[in-house]
A protein has these predicted regions:
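Extended, low-complexity segments enriched in Ser/Thr/Gly and acidic residues that occur primarily
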Residues: 1-35, 55-57, 82
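Tryptophan-centered short beta-strand motifs
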Residues: 3, 31, 37, 43, ...
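Surface-exposed ligand/attachment interfaces on beta-rich extracellular proteins
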Residues: 28-47, 59-66, 88-94, 111-116
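Noncatalytic modules at the cell exterior or secretory-pathway interfaces
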Residues: 50-56, 99-117
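A generic structural motif
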Residues: 57, 71-73, 110, 124
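Short, surface-exposed beta-strand/strand-loop-strand elements in extracellular ectodomains
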Residues: 63-79, 120-122
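An anionic, turn-rich surface loop/hairpin at beta-sheet edges
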Residues: 79-98
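Exposed low-complexity, polar/acidic, P/S/T/G-rich flexible segments that act as propeptides
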Residues: 115-126
């Protein structure tokens, strides 16, 4: 069965691409995240959408690599669970496509090898 979006009345929408405009998720990130966020306040709510595309911009000096991980929020336990991670080995613009399936997600910086770096990430849902 094809995955379809459900409207606010519980009625299936036609299986068409209905992407959102890009919105800011994180900006000015200049250090590895010390831990998971305390709550889901700064996360991306993907309710009603299957995928989330992160458009990631990385700048830096002495840059070798930067690793990000997708976190998934478990609302019953009020905890984050780690998903897949990806390592970038160059600065510039990168895209990361996440199979979110309606979850609440967060892009966490887990490692960096650079003298300095800055990360910004927009997201678009579809």
């Amino acid at each position: 069965m094809t995955n379809v979006r459900i409207d606010q009345n519980g009625i299936p929408k036609a299986p068409v691409l209905d992407p959102t405009a890009p919105l800011l998720h994180r900006s000015g990130v200049t250090a590895v995240d010390a831990g998971d966020p305390a709550d889901a306040g700064g996360a991306v709510d993907c309710a009603g959408y299957e995928r989330c595309r992160f458009d990631i911009s990385i700048t830096g000096a002495g840059f070798t690599s930067l690793t990000v991980q997708i976190l998934f929020w478990n609302s019953r336990q009020s905890l984050w669970f780690g998903g897949a991670s990806r390592q970038f080995t160059s600065t510039g613009q990168h895209t990361l496509d996440v199979d979110a399936r309606g979850a609440t997600i967060f892009l966490k910086v887990t490692a960096a090898t650079a003298t300095t770096f800055s990360l910004a990430a927009d997201y678009a849902l579809s």
